[in-house]
């Protein structure tokens, strides 16, 4: 079976990481022949494309017509789309087309339709469509980066990585600077993060070329920090900390809320600027004893790929149940209340 894997652009973000993992484990565990398709209509990140091309046949398209031609030329049996935009993914007659929603859309189409987390499937579709979660399988760390960046061994290190512009709660710079001023052993290590301060104990780590480098970065930290205004529909960056049995401080707000399913301990959640400052001041490193690693055990390659095969590769086209009566009206009311709540927390 030849399966095309299309997630749009190939970069260092979570969608491309997930696409790579699905393609890799589909071949390893399910015996499929993966073919990676990627959007080259905008600037291409050559190093990221090379990472895929080293393991899979990888082909660029610049428009829908080129993508359709590639699917025909490559004799694709199943067209898999990790979908990040609102418009529907096109159908390809004679080929099974399956759609995997990354965001909170509800537009069932294709021969199979699913979401990237149990929380998202419930929030977007009342649980009437399945979840095929992202794989959490980072490589083991080879060491850590503290010495390389001049961070003392005895320091308490808070780490963050993700999209450069996604540490975007408005009060984050002030909260971090206040905590650094009050605690002399506290350091911040920020990977691939837009600079907001020149404090001597804030270390900016540039984008790393491979997943091993990210694992080394996580190993350098005692606790993670996630402060994304929109929340997380899955939260791979959070999961990479949990996989090394390290806790993560997470904002309790956001439209998307799977991060709260991953981190369910109230002492590692914050709402306001003062909450975060207090959390940074009171945190003391201690062994996780497997507690945090257990949170991501369901996302190991084997169980995820069993679900992937069952939902996307097997059986006839799936039924498309409707949402419950009144579901969207109730969801919109909840979202309005959440926006008001989040606005209050950001200004408190």
Residue positions per predicted region:
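Donor nucleotide-sugar binding/catalytic pocket of nucleotide-sugar-dependent glycosyltransferases
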Residues: 104, 111-141
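Short hydrophobic beta-strand element within catalytic cores of glycosyltransferases
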Residues: 247-252
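Short alpha-helical segment that forms part of, or immediately flanks, the ligand-binding pocket
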Residues: 215, 238-243, 257-258
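N-terminal strand-loop element at the rim of the active site
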Residues: 6-13, 20-67
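Acidic donor-binding loop of glycosyltransferase active sites
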Residues: 76, 216-233, 246
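Conserved catalytic-core segment of nucleotide-activated headgroup transferases in glycan assembly
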Residues: 134-198, 204, 211
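Conserved acidic donor-binding segment of nucleotide-sugar-dependent glycosyltransferases
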Residues: 263-274, 281-285
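A charged, aromatic-enriched C-terminal amphipathic alpha-helix characteristic of glycosyltransferases
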Residues: 14, 284-336
């Amino acid at each position: 079976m030849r399966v095309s894997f299309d997630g749009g652009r190939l970069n260092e973000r979570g969608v491309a990481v997930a696409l790579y993992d699905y393609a890799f484990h589909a071949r390893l565990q399910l015996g499929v022949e993966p073919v990676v398709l990627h959007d080259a209509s905008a600037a291409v990140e050559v190093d990221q494309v090379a990472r895929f091309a080293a393991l899979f046949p990888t082909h660029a398209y610049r428009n829908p017509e080129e993508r359709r031609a590639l699917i025909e030329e490559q004799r694709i049996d199943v067209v898999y789309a990790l979908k990040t935009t609102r418009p529907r993914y096109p159908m390809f007659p004679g080929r099974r087309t399956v759609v995997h929603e990354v965001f909170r859309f509800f537009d069932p189409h294709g021969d199979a339709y699913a979401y990237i987390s149990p929380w998202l499937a419930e929030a977007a579709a009342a649980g009437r469509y399945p979840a095929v979660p992202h794989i959490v399988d980072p490589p083991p760390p080879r060491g850590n980066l503290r010495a390389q960046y001049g961070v003392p061994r005895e320091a308490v290190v808070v780490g963050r990585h993700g999209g450069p512009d996604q540490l975007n709660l408005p009060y984050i710079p002030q909260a971090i600077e206040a905590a650094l001023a009050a605690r002399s052993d506290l350091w911040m290590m920020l990977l691939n993060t837009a600079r907001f301060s020149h404090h001597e104990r804030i270390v900016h780590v540039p984008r790393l070329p491979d997943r091993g480098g990210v694992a080394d970065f996580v190993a350098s930290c005692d606790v993670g920090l996630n402060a994304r205004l929109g929340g997380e529909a899955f939260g791979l960056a959070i999961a990479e900390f949990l996989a090394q049995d390290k806790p993560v401080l997470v904002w309790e707000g956001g439209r998307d809320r799977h991060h709260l399913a991953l981190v369910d301990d109230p002492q590692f959640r914050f709402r306001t600027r003062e909450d975060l400052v207090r959390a940074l001041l009171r945190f003391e490193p201690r062994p996780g004893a497997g507690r945090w690693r257990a949170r991501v055990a369901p996302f190991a390659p084997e169980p995820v790929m069993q679900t992937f095969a069952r939902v996307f590769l097997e059986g006839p086209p799936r039924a498309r149940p409707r949402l419950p009566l009144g579901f969207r009206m109730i969801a919109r009311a909840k979202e309005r209340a959440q926006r008001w709540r989040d606005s209050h927390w950001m200004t408190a």
